[in-house]
């Protein structure tokens, strides 16, 4: 197995990812049905060659002290986007990356 820190590069923090994490934090009382999830979800930037089982093993070994169990892993490959640098004079592309949305079992969380 690869080093877990080579597989999981970093936690992916965006407004959408934080909303997804926040859905599992509330109790859901007095809210519409389906507005909260039972299983916490977190988003990570992972290595481009990482597979779903490898991502699950890496997260379970990194957070072994919290004894988390991964329920499922969904991956998305983000393609490079065109970009302009230096006041629009130079054209280039942003780097492509792979992100993983990881669902933990109920009662398990890394937060």
UniProtKB/Swiss-Prot annotation:
Gene Ontology BP annotations: translation
Keywords, alphabetical: Ribonucleoprotein, Ribosomal protein, RNA-binding, rRNA-binding
GO CC terms of this entry: ribonucleoprotein complex; ribosome
Role this protein plays: One of the early assembly proteins it binds 23S rRNA. One of the proteins that surrounds the polypeptide exit tunnel on the outside of the ribosome. Forms the main docking site for trigger factor binding to the ribosome.
Subunit composition and interactions: Part of the 50S ribosomal subunit. Contacts protein L29, and trigger factor when it is bound to the ribosome.
Any one GO molecular function term: structural constituent of ribosome
Family designation: Belongs to the universal ribosomal protein uL23 family.
UniProt protein name: Large ribosomal subunit protein uL23
Keyword RNA-binding listed: yes
Species in which this protein is naturally found: Chlamydia felis (strain Fe/C-56) (Chlamydophila felis)
Coiled coil: none
InterPro entries documented for this protein: Nucleotide-bd_a/b_plait_sf (IPR012677), Ribosomal_uL23-like (IPR013025), Ribosomal_uL23/eL15/eS24_sf (IPR012678)
Any single Pfam family the record assigns to this protein: Ribosomal_L23
Keyword Ribosomal protein part of the UniProt annotation: yes
